[in-house]
Structures are given as structure tokens and as C-alpha cells.
Amino acid sequence: MKRLLLTSALPYANGHIHIGHLVEYTQTDIFARYWRMTGRRCISLCADDTHGTAIMIRARQEGRSEADVIADMSAAHQRDFAAFQIRFDHYGSTNSPANRALCEEIWASLRERGMVTTKEVTQLFDPQEGMFLADRFVKGTCPKCAAPDQYGDSCDRCGSTYAATDLVEPRSALTGARPEVRSAQHLMVAIEPERPFLSTWTQGEGRMPKEIANYLAGHFLSEPLRDWDVSRPAPYFGFEIPDAPGNYWYVWFDAPIGYMAASKEWCDREGEAFDDWWRSEETEIVHVIGKDIVYFHTLFWPAMLKSARFSLPSRVQVHGFLTVNGEKMSKSKGTFVLASTYLKHLDPAYLRYYYASKLSSKVDDIDLNLEELVNKVNAELVNKVVNLASRSSRFVAQTGLSAVYPEDGGLFASAAEEGDAIGAAYAAFDYARATRSIVALADRANEYVDRMQPWALAKQPEKKAELQAVCTVALNLFRQIVLYLAPVLPKLADDVARLLGCPMDRWALAKTPLVGTPVAAYEHLMKRVEPGAVEKMIAEGRPAEEAAAPGGAAGANAEAGQAAGGGAAAEDDGAALAKEPLAPECTIDDFSKVDLRVARIVAAEHVPEAKKLLKLTVSLGGEARRTVFAGIKAYYKPEDLIGRLVIVCANLAPRKMKFGLSEGMVLAAGDETVHLLSPDSGAKPGMRVH
């Protein structure tokens, strides 16, 4: 079997790890642990992404060097990963000599192949700081909807995207100075010549989720690829480009090369040959990333690797975003939970198991429903899995397991055979299928214990041998289940290894029963989740003023009103009404025919055949789903709509369109721009608007 080199996207060294990040790192860790259990050679690598303007500015503000800032953040990141049992074979930094050397090697290859060009780029310049401003360091008034205090790349209110130079009354977020428009020479990499190759490579069988491959084909590879801007002028924290003094590689150039640098450092430490991992057909390279960085990893990155004659990724596994209780993570609601905050209140095993139960090979978003987290862990892990050991191990603590495996009606053999399918699910990144199968095995094992009643046998001395046999079967079924869960719950596997006095680190162990061995005194393997602990975690995540405010619902409504109505006095000038006068009067009977409902957007995607439309899937509560085509493509990104509550006309007659059936209408306001209408906090999908 080929060697496996596995990577996760590199966390940026300007912020702490939160529960959204942990979706990906948990997904990667489970994959690595499964393959290690099968005996396959696997290295899992990561590093901190350390370059860019944000790091430089933070260091200035804190009066420290960039090196100190990134060193502290690296230590914090690695501490959080270790606490969540996420194991990397090596954890590096993009600000390393190994990364610089590899950047220079790949850059030389790009130069040699004539892929590097120059272009005059116009940007905003802060005269006080003496530096060009990245989009997120410029604020001003949105040129589309006139919303104040918006960033230089997109508007939080109307969702429009634009160039920073289009902002009305722009100002530097660093100094408040009015920026100047200046030009600078930027270095570009032309990847258009690689478009035929990329069109074929992205469609490779198993290369990436099919929906991602189709998205790339329809949105990027169907027309000429733009040159990629890979440089930034000084001042900038990063690697200076050797043949372009005063210019630095942009963070998205050197960040993916960080995968290779981490590999090089690991190889040097372990005495391995770097080319065996990055220039060998005997190595499979798998990247695990979020859907927001697909472009870099599936177009620009493979083109770079090909230019320098390195191996290309065998697979790019893409996951969706995380919502909490159906909504975007929110600091004001306490659902923007840092890893360190979570650890104060809950066991990391809970989150690892919950994420595993939701992750599949598809690019679906994951909702962390906190009530479901409590119920799932308590019902499945504690009541079904761990309870197997607590119900049986104490009866054989003195005698140990039977010397010969007893007759069990085929339960052990069936579970051993099921291990092949569970392993295949892990290998396909379909952890949800794997955990469903494991819970089904736990159900069968508990049915056996319920039927055999070891607690009743323990009261009959003459049935001591039968009691030992029953507990031997129960504990062997339990051991199989925990072996299958070991990639998800490594600490539980370690604890069970101590309880049963046996190794729990090889997948094949589930094929052979454990007999004639002692059993240690039972100790609690996992505690139930207390809802109060979840509530305390959320309370800690809220800003102090939010947590202390009386009348939580009123406070939330006031916040929502302020966000929606900022600058209202300046906009209530009657212009909108004059432009689109009121419609003719209708009766209450006419109006009552229109059924307006609250709905939640659960999926959103581009419609390749339509310039203005997004395809939305909305939930009206429960299993009720509608497909709606909405003309909002110019104003909203699909990924920003997931989880949002909107108002829909639910009884509008379906309309057949060439790209599908539209089963309703989403309500929005506006003339030249579009603003989706959302209900106040407290509204739930399915509620009627009266």
C-alpha cells in the first residue's frame, strides 16, 4: 500500500483555535488514526501560517517582534490541538528556513518556465504608515447601499463585493488617515497555460468531491484563468523575493509550500528522503481543507507543483462550514467558542464524536446543535457503548475472561465482518456512516446483555461459569466497538486497553476474541454531558456586557435593530417611496391568500446557466424543504447565506425554469440593490407571518 502524506489547512498565527477550526483538524486526525491502525505508513503534518500584514500590524500594536507573536501563537495552537487529541507527526511554521528554501526553488521553476509576469496594480496607500493597505485595513461607506463603516472588499449589510478604491470616503483602519490611490508593480503567475491540464486533473476519479470538480469546471475552467498576484510591496512580513528586492511573496504563495516545509523538517529529523514523499508514485498526498479555499488548492497549487516537478495531490477532501444551533457562530450569542473555553467545561471526546457523526465525504455544512450534542453523547456513547463495560466487567474482575471464547450466536463473527465496512467508511471520509454502524453494533451487544442478565446470574453461585461466559462475550463485543471507535476516541481506547489489559492500536485485533486474560477493576470511562456545563460554556463566550444585560431577549432584539437600522435617520428621506409608489389597495381577503413563512436557508449554490440567480434550499421546519431560485447572485455569496432566517412566500405556485423547479419566493427589499428580509430573533422556521 502506498505511503500516505496527510495535511490540514494551516491555521493563521493571528488568532486562537475555535470550534469551527476543529471540524477540519478532527476530520484529518480521524483519517490518520484509522490508517495507522491498519498498519499503513502515514504522516500527518501541519504548521502555522505566519506571514502577512495582519501579523506585522499586531506585532507593532503590541510592541513586540513578529517572531515573538508567532511563537506564542504556535505554542497556543499546539496546546489546543494536543488537548483535543489531535496528533501531528510534525508541526512547523511557514516562517522557517525550510519554507524559504522551497519557496525559492519553486519560484525559480516558475521563472524558468516563463510563468512569472509583472503588472501595474492600483491600491490604496496610507501616507501616515507609509504602506499599501490590504482590503481589510480599509473602511468606508459601501458604494452600493451607502452602509457606513464597511471593509474594503465587501459590505456586511447588502453583501456586495467591490474594490477598495470604490469605497465612499475611505479611511485607513490603522491610522484613520484618508488613503491615497497609488500604483505599484506586482509579480504575477500565469496559470492560464495550465488550464487544459487542470481541466483534466480536477476531474480525476476520487480527486475531490464531484460537486467541487463540477464547480471548478463551470466557474473557472470554462474561461481563461486570471494571472495570480503573488507579491506585496514593502513593508510586509514575509520572505523577500530574491530577484525582486523590496517585494515579498504574498501569504497565499508561501502558505501551501508550508506543507512541504513541514515534510522536509520531519524527514530531516527522522532520516527520511524528502523526495520519497514529494516526488514518488509510492506516496499518496491528501489535503483536507474547507470549501472557502478550494481555488488555491485545486488550481494555483497543482500548477505550482507541476512547474517544479513535484507530486500532485492524490485527493483534496473538502468540508463545509460549521453553524451552531442553525446559525453562524456568534460572539454576542456565545456560540463563537474558543477551544480553550470549550475545554474548561466539556470533554473533547464529546465534540470529536459529534463531529464524526456528522462528517461525510460530501461538502455539506455541519450544524453543531448543542441540545443534540448532549443527547447524542449521553444516549449513544454513555448509555450504549460505555455502559456495556460497566454492566459486565465488575462480575469478572476476580475471575478474568473465559479461557475459551463461548458460543454467542454469531455476534462476535458478525461484528468482525462489519469491521471491513466500517473501515471502508473511514477510508472514504464517511465517518457518519461508520458511527451509525458502530452504534448499531452497540445496540446488538446491549440486547445480548439484556437477554442474558449477568446481574441475575451473579446471584446464583452455581452459575458462576455461565456468568463468566456471558461477561466474556459482552466485553469482547465492547472491545470490538471501542476498537472501531478508536480513530474518533483515542483516549477511550487507551482507557479500555488498561481495563482489559490488551492492546487497542490495531484494526485487525477486532477479528480475534480476547480470552483467558484478567480484567481490571472498573473505573468510569466517560461522564454524562450535563446541560448546565453547555450553558456555562455559552455564557463564558458572550461579551461581558451581553451576559450581564437584563432581559436577554430584549437585549438581543435591541442589538439586531441597531445592526439593521444603523444610519436610519439619514436614509428615511422618502426617495425609495417616490421611486416605487404604493401598489393599489387590496382587501384583507386578498392579502390572506398569501402564506408568508419563516424559513432557514440550509443550502445555497450558484446556477452556472444564470447570471443573476442563486439556488436556495430552505427549510420550513422538520423535513419540509423547498427549492427557490432567487435573483440575488450579485449581492450575496452562497456561503454567507447558510443558516440565515428569511421570509418566503410558501404557497406560490411552482414555476418551471430551464434549470429546475422554483417552489416559492424569498422576500427582499431594494431597487438598485437587494436586501433580504429576516425576522427578529426568536422566530423559528415554519412560523407564519401575520
From Swiss-Prot:
Residues 590-690 form the tRNA-binding domain. Its main location: cytoplasm. A motif ('KMSKS' region) lies at residues 328-332. Its cofactor is Zn(2+). A motif ('HIGH' region) lies at residues 11-21. It is found in: Cytoplasm. NCBIfam families: metG (TIGR00398), metG_C_term (TIGR00399), PRK00133.1 (NF001100). This is Methionine--tRNA ligase 1. The gene is metG1.
